From Swiss-Prot:
Residues lipid-modified (N-myristoyl glycine): G2
Region called Disordered, residue ranges: 493-541
Modified residues (Phosphoserine): S174, S1014
Gene3D superfamilies per UniProt: Formin, FH2 domain (1.20.58.2220), Leucine-rich Repeat Variant (1.25.10.10)
Keyword vocabulary terms for this entry: Angiogenesis, Cell membrane, Cytoplasm, Developmental protein, Lipoprotein, Membrane, Myristate, Phosphoprotein
Subcellular location: Cytoplasm; Cell membrane
Protein name: Formin-like protein 3
Taxonomic source organism: Homo sapiens
Pro residues composition-biased segments: 508-541
Length: 1028
């Protein structure tokens, strides 16, 4: 691609534009040669890998067509041709007449160079910029030469003035002041210093008068404008951009081009500089260039000339738009807020805001958009100050709201405890009613049995009476016959001829009222139970509504053996802990029918998701708080030193005398002695050894004043009657309410949670679904089970589908949503399980027993001392303790019942193990629901994308047609690129400068695009040509 080779082969003669050679097609070469030539064509295109890979899939015919198309575009001139031409324009030895003749074609040569830089392949551009040709240096030198007379034109100087030459030399030397050495990295700084020294030598050798006249001739043409276009084309490559950014004079010369009289050139320069500002590291380089501009042009303030041009060029809208866009970007593309305010203030001092107020009503819509974009980005410092004050007010308001929320949280906690207490009370009443109902049922059964027995006896009595009535006439007849016979025979003869038993039969019968039937004999004992079944046929609980199968009798309960389930695929094993058949009776699992659930589930989907890939210590008891420190001292004076020191500290905290303390202990006065002090004082109960020493000291009648204050206190302290019991009683009195308030919510939580878990019908149905799916998975390997341990619920997340994207719990949540939507909020029936999970029931029961012992201690003390404080305490709190003890018994019974109901043992399963199972299950179930919803939304998005892609590819249904469509599209795109003058943007960072300029023309810059993530290039100093 590039300029066509002309017939003369002389650079600069014909216009350098891409033209097609005659369309005669050459015969196709051998395949090896064809591949070599095709590879060269691909490398010259600089295509991205995906499109190059697609071109390599062409057949030989299409490859040859592409080679022929590309070879019709031949590079007209090599890079050194243009470089030699530009160097000839800079030759100081050329006469003025000869220079006039040469300079006529300078603009034309520059235009051809710009087209070549824009349209030729990357190899041509690299050759132009390499160390041998140094095309960038030549371009920058020519640009500097083309505008060296501009300074004199602005100062109104004519050639021949010695002061002008001094100013010229000063201008050339000022190029050294690019920016402070610390502003750029070491490679930039070293290159800058070395090149700046060379630049000073170059400018100092320029013949002043002749060079000034030649420069004036060049400045009257479009050479500066085209030079900027050449530099823009070079910077559009990542490789060229890095070279321009690291060049010590290039950006400075571009900025100095703003002094050109052509508004179109100024607009081009500002567009390019604005694009560089948006490149990471570019903003600092642009500011350094304007610092250099200030020194060269003798500005009092930076950007002074720029604002002057902005105000004066009001007739050229394109320049004003470009200028406003550059000011917006150079001010607001930095991240540091303080620096943005500083740059903003620079332009404010130069009168930008006043000018914008005048220009806001301009007829140009583009200029209005740029002005509004700048105003939208402006930092209003006053507004920021108001915002800061508003923030402080808001923070104070937040503190008030947080305090209010804290109060509301406390109130909510109190309401929750009240609610839990009410629920627990209702549950206790329900349990009591259930007990009463069981008692009534038992009484009813006994009464029914007695009534049945009485009815049977009455019926038997009636039957016997009827038989007797029926037999009485016969008996009377027989009696009359017998009487007659006896009368004839005589009693003596009769008795001699009959046995005794027959004589009894002839005895007169008793009257009917005295005949009562005997009760039936007792029922025979039940037969012994048969021996247990072998392990291969485990018994099962009865399944209501299931098909009839083998029923085995074990004791008094019958269980039905579950038939194995045949699955289409092998399924993973669900490693649950199954309950034994003899553990099922009386549990929740005896009420479940998992076989009925299987009829409702989508088992085909379940098997497809979960088929295997390969197909073919007991708690420590808390001792009582009221321990006494029994440290035996073998050898002591009166009190051991450390013990006396600690006692003194404790007594100072109380601020009471020893007499006041002992008097308060006598009267159980907790107003004088707070309970905290009593508990501290209990650590200093006198030991037996200390009491002996104190008594001996007293018997010796030694003066008490010689004792230390601690010893005197201990002497009085030890004389208190029943000191240990009194101290323990005071501690109990002081802590009773706190203990009551602490234990009651825990017992209520256990009662409420136990009752709600046991009575939850939705939880039972959830377990039924889990049991059904688990049996379905395990039936072919382990056989069906009748129940499982609750810890098995944690394994639902470990059983994953074939693609590892879904767990068994996710499938259960999906099934519940589709088949059983009423169960979706099953956790609403489980009340206070989280609170119950934090309760140690064993410790709570021990604390209740401890309170009972403490209350018994108070009763004994009250019976001994008859103290009003103790009497009032007993009358007030005995009922509360009784209620607490009843609640403790109810909580224990309710918990034991619910644990046994789920097939667990209360001895091995405390509440801290039982209830957290449900807490974890609920939390995991909710997360599974959320993940299912997220997966559903993602699938819908993917489905919409797929439908959109299918709609676009209606004409490409088969793979061959799709490849053919892609190839045709790529060929058309390549031909469009060849016909255009703009260099195509392929991949990487190439083409970014053009992209930035294009975007900025369509969308005004806002401060949000200045964030680090929106930078277009990485730091240019850290890129070498391998990154291009």
């Amino acid at each position: 691609m590039g300029n066509l080779e002309s017939a003369e082969g002389v650079p600069g003669e014909p216009p350098s534009v891409p033209l097609l050679l005659p369309p005669g097609k050459m015969p196709m070469p051998e395949p090896c040669e064809l591949e070599e030539r095709f590879a060269l064509v691909l490398s010259s295109m600089n295509l991205p890998p995906d499109k190059a890979r697609l071109l390599r899939q062409y057949d030989n015919e299409k490859k040859w067509d592409l080679i022929c198309d590309q070879e019709r575009f031949q590079v007209k001139n090599p890079p050194h041709t243009y470089i030699q031409k530009l160097q000839s324009f800079l030759d100081p030895s050329v006469t003025r007449k000869k220079f006039r003749r040469r300079v006529q074609e300078s603009t034309k040569v520059l235009r051809e160079l710009e087209i070549s830089l824009r349209t030729n392949h990357i190899g041509w551009v690299r050759e132009f910029l390499n160390d041998e040709n140094k095309g960038l240096d030549v371009l920058v030198d020519y640009l500097s030469f083309a505008q060296c007379s501009v300074m004199f034109d602005f100062e109104g100087l004519e050639s021949g003035d010695d002061g002008a030459f001094d100013k010229l030399r000063s201008w050339s030397r000022s190029i050294e002041d690019l920016q402070p050495p610390s502003a750029l990295s070491a490679p930039f700084t070293n290159s800058l210093a070395r090149s700046a020294r060379q630049s000073v030598l170059r400018y100092s050798t320029l013949p002043g008068r002749r060079a000034l006249k030649n420069s004036r001739l060049v400045s009257q043409k479009d050479d500066v404008h085209v030079c900027i276009l050449c530099l823009r084309a070079i910077m559009n490559y990542q490789y060229g951009f890095n070279l321009v950014m690291s060049h010590p004079h290039a950006v400075n010369e571009i900025a100095l081009s703003l002094n050109n009289k052509n508004p179109r050139t100024k607009a081009l320069v500002l567009e390019l500089l604005a694009a560089v500002c948006l490149v990471r590291g570019g903003h600092e380089i642009i500011l350094a260039a304007f610092d250099n501009f200030k020194e060269v042009c003798k500005e009092l303030h930076r950007f002074e000339k720029l604002m002057e041009y902005f105000r004066n060029e009001d007739s050229n809208i394109d320049f004003m738009v470009a200028c406003m866009q550059f000011i917006n970007i150079v001010v607001h593309s930095v991240e540091d807020m303080n620096f943005r305010v500083h740059l903003q203030y620079e332009f404010t001092k130069l009168g930008l805001e006043e000018f914008l107020q005048k220009s806001r009503h301009t007829e140009s819509e583009k200029l209005q958009v740029q002005i509004q974009a700048y105003l939208d980005n402006v930092f209003d410092v006053g507004g920021l100050l108001e915002d800061a004050e508003t923030k402080n007010v808001a923070l104070e308001k937040v503190e008030e709201l947080e305090e209010h929320v804290s109060h509301l949280t406390e109130k909510l906690l109190d309401l929750e405890n009240e609610n839990m207490m009410r629920v627990a009370e209702l549950e206790k009443q329900l349990l009591q009613r259930e007990k009463e109902l069981e008692s009534i049922k038992e009484t009813y059964e006994n009464t029914s049995h007695q009534v049945h027995t009485l009815r049977r006896l009455i019926k038997e009595k009636e039957e016997a009476f009827q038989r007797r009535c029926h037999l009485e006439p016969n008996v009377r007849g027989l009696e009359s016959v017998d009487s007659e016979a006896l009368a004839r025979v005589g009693p003596a003869e009769l008795s001699e001829g009959m046995p005794p038993s027959d004589l009894d039969l002839l005895a007169p019968a008793p009257p009917p009222e005295e005949v009562l039937p005997l009760p039936p004999p007792p029922a025979p004992p039940l037969p012994p139970p048969p021996p247990p079944l072998p392990d291969k046929c485990p018994p099962a609980p009865p399944l209501p509504g299931a098909a009839p199968s083998v029923v085995l009798t074990v004791g008094l309960s019958a269980i039905r053996i579950k038939k194995p389930i045949k699955t289409k695929f092998r399924l993973p094993v669900f490693n649950w802990t199954a309950l034994k058949p003899n553990q099922i009776s009386g549990t929740v699992f005896s009420e479940l029918d998992d076989e009925k659930i299987l009829e409702d589930l989508d088992l085909d989907k379940f098997e497809e998701l979960f088929k295997t890939k390969a197909q073919g210590p007991a708690l420590d008891l808390i001792c009582s708080k009221n321990k006494t420190a029994q440290k035996a001292a073998s050898k002591v004076t009166l009190l051991e030193a450390n013990r006396a020191k600690n006692l003194a500290i404790t007594l100072r905290k109380a601020g009471r005398s020893a007499e006041e303390i002992c008097r308060a202990i006598h009267t159980f006065d907790l107003q004088t002695l707070p309970v905290d002090f009593v508990e501290c004082l209990m650590r200093f109960l006198p030991t037996e050894a200390e009491v002996k020493l104190l008594r001996q000291y007293e018997r010796e009648r030694q003066p008490l004043e010689e004792l230390a204050a601690e010893d005197r206190f201990m002497l009085l302290f030890s004389k208190v009657e029943r000191l240990t019991q009194r101290m323990a009683g005071m501690a109990f009195l002081g802590n009773f309410q706190d203990n009551l308030q602490m234990l009651t919510p825990q017992l209520n939580a256990i009662i409420a949670a136990s009752a709600s878990v046991k009575s939850s019908q939705k939880l039972k149905q959830m377990l039924e679904i889990i049991l059904a799916l688990g049996n379905y998975m395990n039936s072919s390997k382990r056989g069906a089970v009748y129940g499982f341990k609750l810890q098995s619920l944690d394994l639902l997340l470990d059983t994953k589908s074939t693609d590892r994207k879904m767990t068994l719990l996710h499938f259960i949540a999906l099934t519940v949503k589709e088949k059983y939507p009423d169960l979706a909020n099953f956790w609403h029936e489980l009340h206070f399980v989280e609170k119950a999970a934090a309760v140690s029931l064993e410790n709570v029961l021990l604390d209740v027993k401890e309170l009972g012992r403490g209350m018994e201690l108070i009763r004994r003390e009250c019976s001994i001392h008859d103290n009003s404080v103790l009497r009032n305490f007993l009358s007030t709190n005995e009922g509360k303790l009784d209620k607490l003890q009843r609640d403790a018994k109810t909580a224990e019974e309710a918990y034991n019942a619910v644990v046994r109901y789920f097939g667990e043992s209360p001895k091995t399963t405390p509440p801290s193990v039982f209830f957290p199972v449900f807490v974890r299950f609920i939390r995991s179930y909710k997360e599974a629901e959320q993940e299912n919803e997220a997966r559903k939304k993602q699938e819908e998005v993917m489905r919409e994308k797929q439908l959109a892609q299918e709609a676009k590819k209606l004409d490409a249904k088969t793979p061959s047609q799709r490849n053919k469509w892609q190839q045709q599209e790529l060929i058309a795109e390549l031909r469009r690129r060849q016909a255009k003058e703009h260099r195509p943007v392929y991949e990487g960072k190439d083409g970014t400068i053009e992209d930035i300029i294009t975007v900025l023309k369509s969308v005004p810059f806002t401060a949000r695009t200045a964030k680090r993530g929106s930078r277009f290039f990485c730091d240019a100093a850290h890129h070498d040509e391998s990154n291009c």
